[in-house]
Amino acid sequence: LGLKNTNFINATGLTADNHYSTAYDMSLIAKELVKHEKILEFTSTYEDYLRKDTKSPFWLVNTNRLVRFKEGVDGLKTGFTDEAGYCLTATMKKDNMRLITVVMKEENTSKRSADTTKMLDYGFNIYMVQTILDEKTTIEKKKVELGKTLTTEIVPKENITILNKKSEEQKNITY
């Protein structure tokens, strides 16, 4: 993942000697996690019962209140220790753009949510994703020697996009 300033001693995130990370490294972890739909399925759930079909169901509420109160927020991880304060790595998708935010050492959960909301609002108000080349766009047709077909189309594996400020003209990029 390229984590350069992280050393996890335990899986709980609780304070331990030589246990640390940075906002940037936490964003790299989040960037990998959001690639997995099952993760977002869990982290976007505000409340649910665990062990529903047993004699002792357990009601669980997501400590990331933004999942319930800010449309589009679908994760990701809250945390608190005396040393780290209130932390939140959040993610939200809107208009074909996903943003990841990280706040650390916040005073309380309200400040944690408010600062995260400010960052998300800023990002979505200022920036947009521009598709330069659609995955269905033929770049070139190539002749196939001794193939079952005479030609094949060269297309991008996935959409090719760039991040643009909304206030700027969309870039006209040719290939």
Model-derived features: where do they sit?
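Domain-terminus/edge residues, biased toward the C-terminal soluble/receptor-binding domains
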Residues: 3, 7, 15-175
